[in-house]
């Protein structure tokens, strides 16, 4: 979904939850939640070290204190490009899969400084699946899939009818979808 508005709120201008909103929902709610975002490593403030840990180097300037980390809600990049997959969760651990193959399990307790679980993944088309778990018990899941060639516009309205009084409003969300209805 395209970014609409500033990057310092929990919601954008039209009410869509931002990455920051998903992150804080994981911290503040008891309902199990897992959310995936991605960013090419070369554009990220996080870099993977030789030992597999991550170093954070914030952008300079005062505005960085207000903005959230650059991320995207998509899984479509150049083949073999190094992508940082970030997972927000309130589960004790997350297992990440790419096209059904496990990329490993990470514990939230190992990422306490930023509370963001991270993997460096060479991009391949398909589906990322993050499974939030407590031992063998699955608590929550999230997926990102590679979108195909755009083939249709999908409309979603928050209301079906309006009164002709000059005060009613209907929000219409337009998305571009492929044959599998992936945005």
Language model features: what each stretch is:
Residues 1-166, 179-183:
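Substrate-binding clefts and catalytic carboxylate motifs of secreted carbohydrate-active enzymes
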Residues 166-172:
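Short, solvent-exposed loop/turn segments enriched in Ser/Thr/Gly
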């Amino acid at each position: 979904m395209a970014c609409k508005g500033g990057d310092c709120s929990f919601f954008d201008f039209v009410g869509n939850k931002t990455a920051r909103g998903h992150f804080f929902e994981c911290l503040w709610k008891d309902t199990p939640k897992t959310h995936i975002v991605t960013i090419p490593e070369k554009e990220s403030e996080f870099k993977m070290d030789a030992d597999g840990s991550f170093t954070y180097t914030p952008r300079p300037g005062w505005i960085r204190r207000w903005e959230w980390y650059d991320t995207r809600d998509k899984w479509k990049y150049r083949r073999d490009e190094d992508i940082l997959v970030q997972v927000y969760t309130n589960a004790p651990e997350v297992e990440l899969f790419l096209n059904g193959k496990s990329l490993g399990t990470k514990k939230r307790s190992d990422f306490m400084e930023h509370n963001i679980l991270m993997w460096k993944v060479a991009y391949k088309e398909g589906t990322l699946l993050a499974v939030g778990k407590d031992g063998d018990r699955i608590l929550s899941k999230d997926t990102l899939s590679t979108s195909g060639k755009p083939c249709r516009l999908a409309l979603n309205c928050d209301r079906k009818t309006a009164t002709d009084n000059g005060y009613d409003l209907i929000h219409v969300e337009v998305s571009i979808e492929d044959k599998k209805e992936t945005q």
